[in-house]
């Protein structure tokens, strides 16, 4: 009898699980059926004291299909983007600038310790604590601080607090993609930033309210609107925070963001600059192009606490695909940066010369979010029915989602078309349809001739005329052979 009862309970769970999966599939089955794709620009900008954040509408069908959310932020001189964490893994590409960032991994020890006064091992500006003897105050200890520079890709796991700071005169410009459809996101597919400091607008909240995801005019909606703009600590009572942190109410009020100036926002300006505890060789390495790719680990076996969280894929690095007449492409996946396996993401950075082409190809196992960094390119995308769902110029500042298996090709309209593509698989693979070692290249000649109704010489040309793998130089520099 007990066994029958256990089997019945197990069967009920299986039915419920299957029902929930079916329900999710029914809700998502039409999200990737497009008659037309659209290049998107940000439609919201949130100004702060030290910079601004631009966001794209995550309710857009293309973003829903890819399971991603896109934003772009700019940090001015001495600007600090205050700590936050997200409900989904993210990748951040540094298009411009340099500075420092930190990730706070729960349970990992602080490995950076402030030196005893007078030590020259580390360099940081001196700080003065009112009413406290400098010799008696505790030394600062915290988790690792990382340097970043132009071209770096930063991996930020879900639920891990992140902050970033610009210590240079050049603005930091960064593009961020959240993988909202990740298995690590146990909430719905909507992007959420959990701010840990300040009192600012949640960058994606307005889209959530527009989509009607919240309870209609109910108690829950009123409560969320009442708390809009607060950080995580704002929702806790003064008593709880005072007890939890063992501090007085004056400190708690700042923790809750009660003494904020309206213009401060998510990005604040640090007067006199931030006091950052980092080894001096880091500063040197990030002032010299081509250096600074390593995190200066101490040889300890890599765990989540010591994991490498960034890799440079910019212009100064060696390319995976290179043609001096056409351009270059650099990729990063879990084999290059193992932490990407946890995120389920990878990335690609490309530079294509004017009139050169990235041949028709498709992503075998990932959706792709392309962001045009500089210049423009004529892009065509084709769906499973052979319909051209995109046939326009992708311009600087625009983004384009290319769903998995949709074929895509691009021809640069600028001296150098620069782009970054974020992909929803930690080991994303592409298959080229034309060129050397492509689908066409590897078909038997007879199959080509009979599949496309060609003479054998024509089939041979279709297979072999393009000796390039992915990037093809401008057409006027090539001899195109034809059959009379």
Swiss-Prot record:
Disulfide bonds join 32-65, 108-305. Residues 295-298, 479-484 form a propeptide. GO terms for molecular function: nutrient reservoir activity. InterPro entries: 11S_seedstore_CS (IPR022379), 11S_seedstore_pln (IPR006044), Cupin_1 (IPR006045), RmlC-like_jellyroll (IPR014710), RmlC_Cupin_sf (IPR011051), Seed_Storage-Functional (IPR050253). PANTHER family: GLYCININ G3 (PTHR31189:SF77), OS03G0336100 PROTEIN-RELATED (PTHR31189). Residues 1-20 form the signal peptide. Residues 208-233 are annotated as: Disordered. It comes from Arachis hypogaea (Peanut). This is Arachin Ahy-3. Keywords: Disulfide bond, Seed storage protein, Signal, Storage protein. Residues 35-253, 311-460 form the Cupin type-1 domain. Pfam families: Cupin_1. Hexamer; each subunit is composed of an acidic and a basic chain derived from a single precursor and linked by a disulfide bond. Induction: Repressed by water stress. Belongs to the 11S seed storage protein (globulins) family.
